[in-house]
Every structure is written in structure tokens, then in C-alpha cells.
Amino acid sequence: MQSFVQQLKALSSAEDFLQFFGIPFDQKVVNVSRLHILKRFFQYIRQQDVLPEGDEAALFASYHALLLKAYGDFVISTPAQEKVFKVFQDTAGRQHVSLDSLRASLPARTVA
């Protein structure tokens, strides 16, 4: 039988994690926020001062609660509001590009 950590390593998608931990989910929420949910989940894990060691059932319960919390964040909010990724953190999700910088980025035109 695989250890808890080995089983976690085999998971890859948000759906895999949610199913593994027995968390019911709305596919529409996951379709929009899958990467955000997983990143938030791992942020929550890193924020824990102490996680149960040597007790796989307690570790499973802790991870279950953290994933449920991460998923819940995106049920009641949007990725843009949660700002998990840097692109949403910088300048409130807005980026100003001047017309001059766009012109400068275009290749020079040659007259035929």
C-alpha cells in the first residue's frame, strides 16, 4: 500500500486532489480556477506552523481542511479578486502600455 505522500505525488489536476480528499466540487468553478485553487492550497500548507508528522490520518485531515478552504475561496470569489498569481497582484491587474512603446516594438517598415 502506498504512503500518503506517495499518493499525493501521483495527483496532478485540481480534480485529482479534490476527488482524493473526497471534496465535492462544481466543475464550473474548477474549470475557471483550477490553478488558483492548487496554488492557494499549497500556500495554506506552507503557512502552517506545524503539520502532523508520522500520523497519516491526521495529515490527511489537515490537508483536507486546507484544500476545502482553498476551494471555498474560489466558490465565493474570483481569481482576479483573490490575487493568487503575480499578474493579479501587480497594479491591481492593470498594465499601462503607452502608444509610443507599442510603436517602438513594431518592426520597421520598408517601402516596396
Swiss-Prot record:
Q: Which InterPro entries match?
A: NifW
Stretch forming the signal peptide: none
Can you cite a GO biological process for this protein?
Answer: nitrogen fixation
Any single Pfam family the record assigns to this protein: NifW
Q: Which UniProt keywords apply?
A: Nitrogen fixation
Q: What does this protein do?
A: May protect the nitrogenase Fe-Mo protein from oxidative damage.
Known NCBIfam families for this protein? PRK00810.1
Quaternary form? Homotrimer; associates with NifD.
HAMAP family reported for this sequence: NifW
Describe the family membership recorded for this protein in Swiss-Prot or TrEMBL.
Belongs to the NifW family.
**What protein name does the entry list?**
Nitrogenase-stabilizing/protective protein NifW
Origin species: Paraburkholderia xenovorans (strain LB400)
